[in-house]
Amino acid sequence: MILSGKQIKDSLGKDIVIEPFNEKQINPNSYNLKLHNELLVYDEEVLDMKKPNKTKKLIIPEEGIVLEPRKLYLGRTLEYTETDKYVPMLEGRSSIGRLGVFIHVTAGFGDVGFKGYWTLEIFCVEPIRIYSGVEICQIYYHDVGGDYEKYSSGKYQNNKGIQPSLLYKDFIN
């Protein structure tokens, strides 16, 4: 079952944390999250799964920044979230998608117990000017059936900002 907007609001401070929270961003069954003003781009000709890849930080100015097609931009949500007993899911807003912008390539699924900012895998099909503070995606929550263990020690848990791929850690050992 997906939580309603009212259930999301009622769970704030208990099983769900969204900081900062703005009631205007609540939808019937989700909450809109905003884009932070920082982006990362990979600074390598060829990315390598077995090693950390160099990145370069971009700051989105007030007048926005034009994203190039066929280039991956890593962004993050302005909001910090925590979930105690629900599965958090992230989807792009349809208004953003209708401009040819994808906010996640594959990672729209969170784990029960996730704490941190959501890293966005932003990709566009045409050049587009984007702005920090835009409501770029929405988070929604599923109930979990059965017993579960909370996510507590994963690579991306308790992050403080944009997280480039840490896949290389899976190759250690």
Swiss-Prot record:
It is an enzyme of class 3 (hydrolase). One of its GO terms (molecular function) is dCTP deaminase (dUMP-forming) activity. The record marks G108, F109 as: Important for bifunctional activity. Keywords: Hydrolase, Nucleotide metabolism, Nucleotide-binding. Pathway: Pyrimidine metabolism; dUMP biosynthesis; dUMP from dCTP: step 1/1. Its EC number is 3.5.4.30. DCTP binds at R93, S94, S95, I96, G97, R98, D111, T119, L120, E121, Q138, Y151. CDD domains: trimeric_dUTPase. GO terms for biological process: dUMP biosynthetic process; dUTP biosynthetic process; nucleobase-containing small molecule interconversion. It catalyses: dCTP + 2 H2O = dUMP + NH4(+) + diphosphate. The active site is at E121 (proton donor/acceptor). NCBIfam families: dCTP_deam. Homotrimer. Belongs to the dCTP deaminase family. HAMAP family: dCTP_deaminase (MF_00146). PANTHER family: DCTP DEAMINASE (PTHR42680:SF3). Bifunctional enzyme that catalyzes both the deamination of dCTP to dUTP and the hydrolysis of dUTP to dUMP without releasing the toxic dUTP intermediate. This is dCTP deaminase, dUMP-forming.
